[in-house]
Amino acid sequence: MANVVVVGSQWGDEGKGKIVDWLSEQADVVVRFQGGHNAGHTLVVDGVTYKLSLLPSGVVRPGKLSVIGNGVVLDPQALVDELARLESQGVHVGPDRLRIAENTPLILPLHRELDALRENASEGTRIGTTKRGIGPAYEDKVGRRAIRLVDLVDPKALPAKVERLLTHHNLIRRGLGVEEVNPQALVDELLALAPKVLPYMDRVWELLDKARKDGKKILFEGAQGALLDIDHGTYPYVTSSNTVASSAAGGSGVGPGALDYVLGITKAYTTRVGEGPFPTELTDEVGKTLGTKGREFGVVTGRPRRCGWFDAVLVRQTVRTCGIHGIALTKLDVLDGFDEIKVCVGYKLDGKEIDYFPSEMGAQARVEPIYETIEGWTDSTAGARSWADLPAEAVKYVRWLEELIGCPVAVLSTSPERNDTILVHNPFQA
């Protein structure tokens, strides 16, 4: 019986929501281990659509324990709002169904304001953040001045911690010509939220250790994608946390030995939201067709996603940096009807062929994709639930991708519906 880590193998938006929902039916515990409420996912359960951005996917399923780990940055107001939205849809999430690590750093209004101020002032050099305060909150965590969930327990000690935080932030705000934050007002705001969020607080490391010893199946759910990792992604056009699979351990308080199987969610083509390099991006009619057929708009931001052909170089690199055992290939049906399909199998950099994606920003912008072409298919793959249902050319495409990235397909998704899935290998039976 294995514990499973799910990560996106590209720039996010690979279809993790459906796969995690499908896996969460088998899991006993579902854990979010990094990120914040900047990465949304959509679930369809019993015909009802749920849009989540902070809570783990298992939260909409009765009998599942959902956990937010210490690697997440938590906006307490966003948590309260998301819980209220679920309540309005008939899903009550009490402390018996959700636990949050006591050492989770909080996103405060000043983080959101700073995020927006920086992004709006960075004309021409924007990173493409969602302006939800994720980056500034992680900065405070690393700077050892963050307000953490457990800090809300003691009202007498909280003001001194807020003063220490504001020594840093008000200095920045003065430099930006923005009104300073009143310490008492921030303390009052936090203490007003405390009764709404503290009932969910727990020692998550201890809770997960007990779950492991009790033989529970644990699903670790990553947000975004590995190419947005702060170290291994397309820096500086990345998120502010480690999104690779190994961060599931540090971001939830378990040892690396608790991670048995890594499933990489991989789109059958490539998309990206926001700024940054994208070697296979298509700005022609083909790119528009991929975007239209794939309904490529961000769940959180509503921004249209940039679209391009599958990049085997990037995914092969992610397979290595994440230690991926198998991939879940999604949105194969979007490629239905193309006469031919291209795949990037290498790059040219300054006239030289390379088989990796460089770390330096200038080199990332200069790489040119080397394509190979495969015959497309006219028959539909939508709704296929077995290999026999797929056109021969589609099967050939899938096998070709396996060969190029050096990793087998464990799951194949052929539509947004959770049952339209071909299971090759169950990750929980690793």
Swiss-Prot record:
Catalytic site: D13, H41
GO cellular component, one term: cytoplasm
Gene3D superfamilies with a match to the protein in the record: Adenylosuccinate Synthetase, subunit A, domain 1, Adenylosuccinate Synthetase, subunit A, domain 2, Adenylosuccinate Synthetase, subunit A, domain 3
Binding site for substrate: V299, V300, T301, G302, R303, P304, R305
Entry note: cofactor: Binds 1 Mg(2+) ion per subunit.
UniProt pathway: Purine metabolism; AMP biosynthesis via de novo pathway; AMP from IMP: step 1/2
Metal-binding keyword on record: yes
InterPro entries with a match to the protein in the record: Adenylosuccin_syn_GTP-bd, Adenylosuccin_syn_Lys_AS, Adenylosuccinate_synth_dom1, Adenylosuccinate_synth_dom2, Adenylosuccinate_synth_dom3, Adenylosuccinate_synthetase, P-loop_NTPase
Keywords: Cytoplasm, GTP-binding, Ligase, Magnesium, Metal-binding, Nucleotide-binding, Purine biosynthesis
Subcellular location: Cytoplasm
Pfam families: Adenylsucc_synt
Enzyme Commission designation: 6.3.4.4
Entry function: Plays an important role in the de novo pathway of purine nucleotide biosynthesis. Catalyzes the first committed step in the biosynthesis of AMP from IMP.
Oligomeric and partner information: Homodimer.
Protein's recorded name: Adenylosuccinate synthetase
Species, as recorded: Azorhizobium caulinodans (strain ATCC 43989 / DSM 5975 / JCM 20966 / LMG 6465 / NBRC 14845 / NCIMB 13405 / ORS 571)
Lineage: Bacteria, Pseudomonadati, Pseudomonadota, Alphaproteobacteria, Hyphomicrobiales
Gene: purA
